[in-house]
Regions:
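Catalytic core of carbohydrate-active enzymes
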Residues: 399-400, 409-417, 431, 439-449, ...
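Gly/Pro-rich turn-and-neighbor structural signature
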Residues: 189, 194-208, 212, 216, ...
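Aromatic-lined carbohydrate-binding/catalytic grooves of carbohydrate-active enzymes
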Residues: 177-372
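Catalytic and substrate-binding clefts that recognize carbohydrates or anionic sugar/phosphate headgroups
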Residues: 48-183, 189-191, 196, 203-208, ...
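A low-complexity, Ser/Thr/Gly/Pro-enriched, surface-exposed linker/loop concept
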Residues: 12-53
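Solvent-exposed beta-strand/loop surfaces of large extracellular or lumenal domains
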Residues: 31-46, 245, 588-607, 715-738
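Short, well-ordered beta-strand segments enriched in hydrophobic/aromatic residues
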Residues: 11, 19-21, 57-64, 560-563, ...
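Surface-exposed interaction regions enriched in Ser/Thr/Asp/Glu
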Residues: 740-753
């Protein structure tokens, strides 16, 4: 390892662009991993020299200078950064003036624009992440580091090579994890008291109204709580509560008045291809009214656990005071105790997962009660709980699946995230798009938003706004409808009347059809540490225009989206958008109109479309519409290519696996390179699969190849059984190749007549 100790300072060259800088009072340093740093990254090639009291560490991207014996200060610690076109100097304590922004932890209560905290990417060409004072892992659990360890900084130097910065983040902190495939699908959520019959009816309605559904979210009314309490219900008599003293805000006992047979309900939903998540507010822990309390306390007794969390007298509920003399032992929620959290998960969460719960919606809101984790210094709950819940979900070969607010740098390893309770306004939608695109700058690739907004201040339905919000959801990481417990607001699309229902249906169908592409770029995000939603400047950092369009973004490398964030005009809600198209040739996905890039274009969209473009020549893998978009086997692959008359060559890698395990990490996947070439005469499409395959892979596949913007009909040199048709109105040629094995390689040649 390229690591050097000089007095009370230690420096570690991790990559060519990252140096760790530590300073202590006693020359004792921290080697354990933290929530941010994983310590398993390779060491970079670096040269160390010392002349007198000045040491220099040089890598390919930076030269760091430190005066031995001095505390870190602008006069004692600096670095010259030399990467590509960027030559600059960093000094300890410098402010990152031109940071491109990161992401907020939550959008709770947000109505319009909010300032963003710093992300990793900056036009200054560097950024410093401060990991000082954070606990370190010892034998699999966090412990406070020595107070003598004063400073723990990571200097990232990348110039304007933004992809390299995120790749370095993955080296230092860990890769951006791939979520379970169903996270990319259609979610339904509403803060509402549903019965088992109503949950099943929801699925029936989705199918009957021709909308896809993959995940059903059961908000907090799946368990007993104060609101709606009836005599004889289990009721909390202990705890702090939330929202005006509702002690049932935390709950772990199924409301059997509404859901008498939870296991039976979950089994029925699973048979219909629906995954289920339960809302979880853990702040009051598992108390004596819960059905899992006996198992929980038994485990704690076996561990000889003792209460460690001090009481907060001014937050104690009146109900608890009245019942404080009961001969019952209750333990405060204690995320800092390994014994407590092991019993917490095993007694309750594991049992409900055996019943059929797929993952948990960690809805932590209680920093006002517990600003710090008990016994872990200044560590706040959210990043630690995100780590614990994600680690808990990685059982029996399953890949982790979290669903929580964003916990800051390092939390990119625990997807997916929900942004919280926004207000339904056009300004909020615009800000949400901007923040989601900027979030990738911090490694946060997987935002799931309350589509339509959580709270709607308007006295009338904002139908146009809802449709446009859905269109943004189509081109983001997750399509999750959600709303507050207001009987006047219902996010079921078919309840909104026409033309809104039909417009949303078309968008939901588009999402379903795009899943092969979306899941492939999700894997690309994991593999290459690039965001799924990429700002225009990400690969075009020297182009000033790329910084001026914060709500336009690449969706992977093949598509570009610019969601409509303002009301349209007239009966068709025609919205005018100015969109910057990067260099190259682009096609409007909805109309097939061709545009030359490198400039701003003006485009109009009615309610049934929005600015969505496909790069010319890029094979776009799709599937026929299916109402279970993330679990239906890909037995029919559609590859759409907007090719036109330009000579070009391009490719895309289709990624497939079982969607739920970590088998892909050890080769259990199929990666198929889809290649398109046009030399001015012949068009060639190649299908080249690689990889070991995976359990459940389909054995027979039909391929439909769609070539758009072709002037005349074509004949085909293709595998036996191939059928060719030409649609003159759409200028689209179609080839259908039936019944081949997904493991077979082949090519198709088309020659203009």
């Amino acid at each position: 390892m390229n690591q050097w100790t000089v007095g009370n300072a230690r420096f570690t060259a991790i990559t060519d662009g990252v140096i760790r800088m530590e300073y202590t009072k006693d020359a004792v340093f921290a080697d354990g991993a933290t929530l941010f740093a994983n310590r398993s990254c390779p060491a970079a090639g670096a040269a160390f020299t010392q002349e007198g009291d000045i040491v220099t560490i040089a890598t390919k991207k930076l030269t760091l200078t430190y005066r031995v014996g001095a505390p870190f200060a602008p006069e004692s610690l600096s670095a010259k950064i030399h990467t590509g076109k960027v030559e600059t100097t960093w000094k300890y304590g410098d402010k990152n003036e031109n940071n491109l922004g990161g992401t907020l932890a939550t959008l709770d209560g947000v109505d319009g624009h909010r300032p963003l905290p710093d992300g990793l990417l900056s036009r200054d060409g560097w950024h410093v992440i401060d990991d000082s004072g954070t606990p370190v892992f010892v034998d699999g659990w966090l412990q406070c580091r020595s107070q003598e360890h004063l400073c723990d900084l990571y200097l990232f130097a990348y110039g304007h090579d933004y992809p390299a910065a995120l790749q370095d983040l993955a080296f230092v902190s860990g890769k951006m994890a791939l979520p379970r495939k169903y996270a990319l699908g259609s979610w339904y959520s509403r803060w509402w008291r549903y019965s088992a019959e109503q949950f099943l009816q929801l699925v029936d309605e989705y199918d009957a109204n021709d909308f896809p559904l993959d995940i059903l979210v059961m908000d907090m009314d799946w368990h007993y709580q104060d609101w709606g309490y009836e005599e004889g219900d289990p009721r909390a008599l202990y705890g702090y509560g939330h929202a005006g003293g509702n002690l049932g805000w935390t709950g772990y006992t199924w409301n059997r008045r509404e859901i008498p047979d939870p296991a039976g309900l979950l089994a029925q939903l699973h048979r219909r291809g629906i995954a289920v998540t339960l809302n979880d507010h853990p702040a009051d822990g598992i108390r004596d009214h819960e059905e899992t309390y006996p198992a929980f306390t038994k485990m704690l007794r076996e561990k000889h656990y003792q209460e460690e969390v001090p009481l907060i007298p001014d937050k104690q509920s009146e109900r608890e005071r009245e019942n404080s003399k009961r001969d019952v032992v209750n333990f405060r929620f204690n995320a800092g105790s390994r014994d407590y959290m092991e019993a917490f998960f095993e007694s309750t969460h594991t049992q409900y997962e055996k019943m059929g719960v797929d993952f948990w919606w960690l809805d932590w809101q209680q920093d006002y009660l517990y600003p710090m984790v008990n016994g872990l210094g200044t560590l706040t709950h959210l990043p630690w709980l995100n780590y614990l819940y994600y680690a808990h979900s990685r059982k029996n070969g399953l890949r982790g699946m979290s669903f929580s607010r964003w916990g800051g740098f390092g939390d990119h390893k625990h997807p997916i995230y929900f942004s919280g309770d926004t207000v339904s306004t056009w300004d909020t939608l615009a800000f949400q798009v901007y923040m989601t695109v900027s979030a990738g700058n911090a490694g946060c690739f997987w935002w799931s938003h309350d589509i339509g907004g959580f709270e709607d201040p308007s006295p009338e339905k904002q139908s146009e706004l809802y449709v446009r919000w859905v269109q943004f959801g189509i081109t983001s990481a997750a399509l999750r409808l959600h709303v507050c417990g207001n009987e006047k607001i219902d996010r079921r699309p078919w309840t909104w009347g026409e033309p809104y229902c039909s417009a949303m249906r078309e968008m939901f169908h588009l999402r379903s059809m795009l899943i092969p592409y979306l899941y492939s770029i999700a894997y690309e995000s994991y593999r290459d540490s690039v965001p799924m939603l990429r700002p225009l400047y990400f690969f075009d950092s020297e182009n000033k225009e790329a910084y001026d369009h914060p709500t336009t973004y690449y969706l992977g490398g093949s598509m570009l989206a610019a969601p409509v964030c303002q009301p349209g005009e007239g009966e068709t809600f025609l919205a005018l958008s100015k969109v910057y198209l990067p260099a190259g040739t682009w096609y409007d996905y909805f109309t097939g109109i061709r545009y030359k890039g490198g400039k701003v274009i003006t485009i109009q969209n009615d309610l049934y479309s929005f600015p969505l473009f496909v790069r010319a020549g890029k094979p776009l893998p799709m599937q026929p519409y299916t109402n279970r978009m993330t679990s239906t086997p890909l037995s029919h692959l559609i590859v759409r290519i907007f090719g036109g008359e330009e000579t070009l060559s391009d490719s895309f890698t289709l990624f497939e696996d079982d969607g739920i395990t970590e088998g892909y990490m050890s080769g259990a996947y199929r990666a198929t390179e889809l290649i398109y070439k046009y030399d001015g005469k012949n068009r060639t499409f190649s299908y080249t699969p690689t990889g070991d395959g995976y359990p459940g892979e389909c054995t027979s596949r039909t391929l439909t190849l769609e070539l758009w913007d072709i002037e005349e009909a074509c004949c085909a040199d293709a595998p036996k059984g191939t059928a060719f048709t030409y649609d003159a109105n759409r200028r689209c040629g179609k080839l259908e190749i039936p019944g081949f094995s997904p493991t077979d390689a082949f090519s198709v040649t088309l020659t203009n007549l």
